[in-house]
Amino acid sequence: MSSSPSPFGQNEWLVEEMYRKFREDPSSVDPSWHEFLVDYNPEPTTDSSASENGQQTRTAAPKAPPEPAPAPAPKSQDSKSQAPKQDSKPQESKPQAKAKPAESKSSTKPADAKSEKSGKSGTNGAAKPAAQPADDSDQNQVLRGAAAAVAKNMSASLDVPTATSVRAIPAKLMIDNRVVINNHLKRTRGGKISFTHLIGYAIVAAVKKFPNMNRHFAEVDGKPNAVTPAHTNLGLAIDLQGKDGNRQLVVAAIKKADTMRFGQFIAAYEDIVRRARDGKLTAEDFSGVTISLTNPGTIGTVHSVPRLMRGQGAIIGVGAMEYPAEFQGASEERIADLGIGKLITLTSTYDHRIIQGAESGDFLRTVHQLLLSDDFFDEIFRELGIPYEPVRWRTDNPDSIEDKNARVIELIAAYRNRGHLMADIDPLRLDSNRFRSHPDLDVLTHGLTLWDLDREFKVNGFAGAERKKLRDVLAVLRDAYCRHIGVEYTHILEPEQQQWLQERIEGKHEKPTVAQQKYILSRLNAAEAFETFLQTKYVGQKRFSLEGAETVIPAMDAVIDQCAEHALDEVVIGMPHRGRLNVLANIVGKPYSQIFSEFEGNLNPSQAHGSGDVKYHLGSSGTYLQMFGDNDITVSLTANPSHLEAVDPVMEGLVRAKQDLLDKGDTEDGYTVVPLMLHGDAAFAGQGVVAETLNLALLRGYRTGGTIHLIVNNQIGFTTSPAAAKSSEYCTDVAKMIGAPIFHVNGDDPEAAVWVSRLAVDFRQKFKKDVVIDLLCYRRRGHNEGDDPSMTQPSMYDVIDTKRGVRKSYTEALIGRGDISMKEAEDALRDYQGQLEQVFNEVRELEKHEIEPSESVEADQQIPAKLATAVDKSLLARIGDAHLAVPEGFTVHPRVKPVLEKRREMAYEGKVDWAFAELLALGTMISEGKLVRLSGQDTRRGTFTQRHSVVIDRKTGKEFTPLQLLATDSDGNPTGGKFLVYDSPLSEFAAVGFEYGYSVGNPDAMVLWEAQFGDFINGAQSIIDEFISSGEAKWGQLSDVVLLLPHGHEGQGPDHTSGRIERFLQLWAEGSMTIALPSTPANYFHLLRRHSLDGIQRPLIVFTPKSMLRNKAAVSDIRDFTEQKFRSVLEEPTYTDGDGDRNKVTRILLTSGKIYYELVARKNKESRDDVAIVRIEQLAPLPKRRLAETLDKYPNVDEKFWVQEEPANQGAWPTFGLTLPEMLPDHFTGIKRISRRAMSAPSSGSSKVHAVEQQEILDEAFAP
């Protein structure tokens, strides 16, 4: 008998089958086989093995295979192995029968398990018996195809002298780490890792240390040789099921496995298995196997001695994974208590001619060591992108369960406190070699090991249980705190809030429905397609794209949707320019045509007002309709400048105004307008206004019931890396000051972002507090589209340039899970792109308008003529009476009582001082139904103890607000008016921004902010520059906020002197605001009332007095309130009410503010009839006509001076010195200045120097 083996070994049956198909129909065979099969020449399987039907069995042999042919293990009980599925365990495979050697001139049944059960041959080609023999007679059958190949190769294998090494290896570490790996894969890209993957990779790694195990024996020219292949080609035994249900074994090679990392090894492994099952293996896949892996453990075999085929040096058998036999009857609890783990037996059957027993034994020992090694699993975890440390092999700790109970409780607390440090939240993973870990979160730190995983401990109600296995405790903790969401909440002081969050974070999260997943995908499609479209159509134009952070769109959508679910009234969005156009299009619903028109520069002149602004600063509003509900909600986006975070307090003020208009109160049903604030990571950590605005969150005068903060954390600030941008661990640490929960979310997981967004709204509704969502993502391009970020962050952008977008990765995840088909995904994206293309083409066809210089907005709002601001005397009396209408039993402070009594007296008899004139103005507005809001530092009492708008009970601390009595008329009916007066925090930037926003949100309210001293207004300079002075011109955003800035030179030093008149005058243009420096209480009264009644929405800047508050000359008579109106230019009373002769005047001193009283006093002292003093009460807009009319009354004037306290380069002169001669050349040509010298500081730091300087001004003014 000739039994020379085929170079294809046990794969010979497959070659035969391919050849048969090729002869019948070449197109039925994969083209990769054609070249081989054309030259294929079948040869007889045996000398003479005629079957019962007279046919002869033949086998195939190739002419000259390029490499040694594969020689897989024979199909026997010990060696046949089905390649494990990715999620299978060894014991899950079905048993396989043992093959017997072929015998001469007789045919035996192939020992295939399914063949034995079915009574059929192991191959499709086996002939049936010619006649059915008697029941007790033997049956003969010719072996063909696979069965014949098995028989022949088993016989040939007897020529190989083999020996076998056996080693039992602890499997517990492999089991536990596989659980961690597969759970991670399940949450992310899908798929599973099998034990065979791990063992196979360990074998390849061990071969690198023992390359002799990869050699094979060969005779060359009749001489024995040991052949050392260039690479390790690991042969995998793969069990295939034919169409008739019969199973056959092929052995295909993972080529060059020694050059692969674990991820590449898995990909090659899965490719081989997939192509084997799809019938796509080629001849190349069967050639060159150098060492084989077979896994009979899948049927429970503890260990086997598989046959070694020619061309290989060793075959490794994997046995079943079992507890030691003596413990297989023990309970799980007993096994856990004893620390007993499962074992897996590996065998190394090797060619004893070239490999010795010691080498084989050391080889298995190395595999053993690798499968328990920290470094081995570290490499695997890093390759799979698992950010956590693997389970470590450590000796069991013998401490008592009672002692370990406390350690488990400590571990739970540690995860709640520090779990976020281990969370997988960075989509870039720039430090791919670093595991997310912390010593407090390591079980080893707590004296626990992998042997404790299956032991039960007391957990005191954790996750709804009193006792839990440590494995289950860790599963809950890691799912809650260490996945794609990191949570910080233990800094919150209120136990109820912590408990509420714990229950939701540690509870099982429901997976989104398929419909919800498709909706999330649609939002990502919209976000990405919008940016891609703009990038394609408007190359190089700045738009500050959202690319890399597209998850912002579904996250914002979820916030708004959940607000609608709670039946709230409105969501107001404030955000910087990054991604703003995307938000306008896909969240607010701004028409694409309008956005594209702005890119085209196609502006309609009839709609253009003022200077305008770049497209990524503009605001808009729309209505959001729930996708999975019946509610809708208004959505608005506030305009913003490029000054990052400056919009924060503005938006909060706007929201508070809307809430006050709804007037639902501080109740469960209140705060139905929700602020949604977007931030950048660098700005959130770096801009002080963030902390100022956060500080407003829980204050009575400022709270809005909780803001949802969404940080678009692209891990860079223009070119500044996080290490240079913040000293804290997170950019969000500043938010801990107000006890806000903080969620760090991986931007590559849109489902996690949506879940957190909804939770944030629920928390806000429950506790009326801020919530912070830190969405970690990246910036696909530079700070703008023309920037190259690789110049400063080369490593980061090496990663970003090769990174797939979140839309693509999420789409693949949905397709991989079978939630949607590829066609559905492509159709959805194509539909959205089609919409954009259609609108783009429509915009291109729109009428083009010639670009013209922008027009002033000044003419858009004109003060009505003859506006009456006087009031009836009875109303003044009623306000005076209100100051003494204290509640019964109320104890007024002994120093305040005289003030209240004096006010009642002034209301009836006159000589009204400044503070009371202000309260009279506000009181009349309240009585007329106006909401008046007054705030500032020390505003309720007044910096100079002048206002006392709120009176405090000396004994109980209760409050009494006299003007609130004006909210009802004399008959007790509500007027609709309100008086809201608050002391602000020690802030200017946020406080002024808030009041500006409030005035925008409620145009009908009278909103006033008072500085402690006018000097401190420069702390709010960004708000003044970006909003107050230019908001109307840039965005058409109207405000009539009032700033009260105490101003005046009184020797208190450079920081308690100036409200910086010069700066406001420099900013003034286009009627953008009214700037006034009134000098009488009555004129101040009428100024405020005119501002309230004129219907003009423009800010009012008032420089208010300090020492003049108590100047006995600075008072007003009752009829000045009942008969007069605001007068922008004032003459001396001696000319308007007395007998002063204007014809005697040769010198006019123009001035403003408190210095008027000093000039008058000097004039009277010297009896200077030749000098007249004219006050300009309104500095801007300059009252040109009124000023000219006043000057014309003095026909003999030959000298005109502008007199001011301020230095020459400050105050009104830098503006007036230029504009007055231009505006009224006939009146002001040659006008001269009298002031302090030009100074870099507003004033001298010495009161004595101040007095000398002040005297010099007066001396010069009245010099002969």
UniProtKB/Swiss-Prot annotation:
Region feature 2-oxoglutarate dehydrogenase E1, N-terminal part, mapped onto this chain: 1-41
Transmembrane segments: none
UniProtKB keywords: Acyltransferase, Allosteric enzyme, Coiled coil, Decarboxylase, Lyase, Magnesium, Metal-binding, Multifunctional enzyme, Oxidoreductase, Thiamine pyrophosphate, Transferase, Tricarboxylic acid cycle
Superkingdom: Bacteria
Names of the cofactor(s): Mg(2+); thiamine diphosphate
Start and end residues of each stretch annotated as 2-oxoglutarate dehydrogenase E1, C-terminal part: 374-1264
GO BP term, pick one: tricarboxylic acid cycle
Binding-site positions, thiamine diphosphate: 578, 642, 644, 681-683, 714
Region called Linker, residue ranges: 42-102
UniProt-listed Gene3D superfamilies: 3.40.50.12470, 3.40.50.970, Chloramphenicol acetyltransferase-like domain, Multifunctional 2-oxoglutarate metabolism enzyme, C-terminal domain, TPP helical domain
Keyword Metal-binding: yes
UniProt signal peptide: none
Active site (record annotation): 352 (proton acceptor)
Catalytic activity: glyoxylate + 2-oxoglutarate + H(+) = 2-hydroxy-3-oxoadipate + CO2; 2-oxoglutarate + H(+) = succinate semialdehyde + CO2; N(6)-[(R)-lipoyl]-L-lysyl-[protein] + 2-oxoglutarate + H(+) = N(6)-[(R)-S(8)-succinyldihydrolipoyl]-L-lysyl-[protein] + CO2; N(6)-[(R)-dihydrolipoyl]-L-lysyl-[protein] + succinyl-CoA = N(6)-[(R)-S(8)-succinyldihydrolipoyl]-L-lysyl-[protein] + CoA
GO CC field: cytosol; oxoglutarate dehydrogenase complex
Activity regulation field: Alpha-ketoglutarate dehydrogenase and decarboxylase activities are inhibited by unphosphorylated GarA, and allosterically activated by acetyl-CoA, the main substrate of the TCA cycle.
Residues noted as binding Mg(2+) in the record, renumbered to the chain: 681, 714, 716
Chain spans, region Succinyltransferase E2: 103-373
Biological pathway: Carbohydrate metabolism; tricarboxylic acid cycle; succinate from 2-oxoglutarate (transferase route): step 1/2; Carbohydrate metabolism; tricarboxylic acid cycle; succinyl-CoA from 2-oxoglutarate (dehydrogenase route): step 1/1
EC number: 2.2.1.5, 4.1.1.71, 1.2.4.2, 2.3.1.61
Family of the protein in this entry: Belongs to the 2-oxoacid dehydrogenase family. Kgd subfamily.
Oligomer status and interactors: Homodimer. The 2-oxoglutarate dehydrogenase (ODH) complex contains multiple copies of three enzymatic components: 2-oxoglutarate dehydrogenase (E1), dihydrolipoamide succinyltransferase (E2) and lipoamide dehydrogenase (E3).
Function of the protein: Shows three enzymatic activities that share a first common step, the attack of thiamine-PP on 2-oxoglutarate (alpha-ketoglutarate, KG), leading to the formation of an enamine-thiamine-PP intermediate upon decarboxylation. Thus, displays KGD activity, catalyzing the decarboxylation from five-carbon 2-oxoglutarate to four-carbon succinate semialdehyde (SSA).
Domain notes: Is a fusion protein with two major domains exhibiting structural features of an E1 and E2 protein, and a short sequence stretch of E1 localized at the N-terminus, which is connected by a linker region to the rest of the protein.
Protein name: Multifunctional 2-oxoglutarate metabolism enzyme
Gene designation: kgd
